[in-house]
Amino acid sequence: MNNLWKAWVGLWTSMGPLIRLPDGITKAGEDALRPWKSTAKHPWFQIEDNRCYIDNGKLFARGSIVGNMSRFVFDPKADYGGVGENLYVHADDVEFVPGESLKWNVRNLDVMPIFETLALRLVLQGDVIWLRCVPELRVDYTSSAYMWNMQYGMVRKSYTHVAWTIVFYSINITLLVLFIVYVTVDCNLSMMWMRFFVC
């Protein structure tokens, strides 16, 4: 029964606006399966900030490291419960000041509802550093991300979350239908709205 539930949830989460799958299960020796701790031999750096949250299906993350570094590799990965996916960020999301600091402010990354943790693989001066961030969930039930919110609730087995999403989505659809019917039935009102949008 549990496998059937997982298969159904997997099918459900692959539908809707998030029609994409992770890169696949990583092999035993690959970076995505390394422990969530720093592998640097000399802790010559200081982590000042490492935060992330999900806002209606979009991942936001920010953080900073201070230390004397002249080169770096910034490699963020999404962890989908043992399945890793590389996240692609813009160059202006990362700010590097040689010899001083490395800061990142990643915005609007699409993640699937089965997202668990953000793993940051940093290579600073040849030392490999792993940072882990468990995102805070911020939900706006009135947003257009109703499908993502429903999928998230199904994956986490949070039926209250699913119920609230359905309630607010039903209200939005009802108001939209009432508006369309109200405007199209009354010709004078319809002409008034047309003049409003044309002007």
Swiss-Prot record:
Ubl conjugation as UniProt keyword: no
Taxonomic lineage: Viruses, Duplodnaviria, Heunggongvirae, Peploviricota, Herviviricetes
Domain remarks: The lumenal domain allows tight interaction with class I molecules encoded by the HLA-A locus.
GO cellular component: host cell endoplasmic reticulum membrane; membrane
Pfam families given in the database record: Cytomega_US3 (PF05963)
Membrane side Lumenal: residue ranges: 1-161
Side Cytoplasmic, residues: 183-199
Disulfide topology: 52-133
Oligomer status and interactors: Monomer. Interacts with host TRAM1.
Function statement: Participates in the inhibition of the host immune response. Early protein that redirects newly synthesized major histocompatibility complex (MHC) class I heavy chains via the SEC61 translocon to the cytosol where they undergo proteasome-dependent destruction. In consequence, infected cells are masked for immune recognition by cytotoxic T lymphocytes. Seems so far to be specific for HLA-A, HLA-B, and HFE loci products. Does not interact with HLA-DR or HLA-DM.
Cellular compartments annotated: Host endoplasmic reticulum membrane
Name of this chain's protein: Unique short US2 glycoprotein
UniProt keywords, alphabetically: Disulfide bond, Early protein, Glycoprotein, Host endoplasmic reticulum, Host membrane, Host-virus interaction, Immunoglobulin domain, Membrane, Signal, Transmembrane, Transmembrane helix, Viral immunoevasion
Transmembrane spans: 162-182
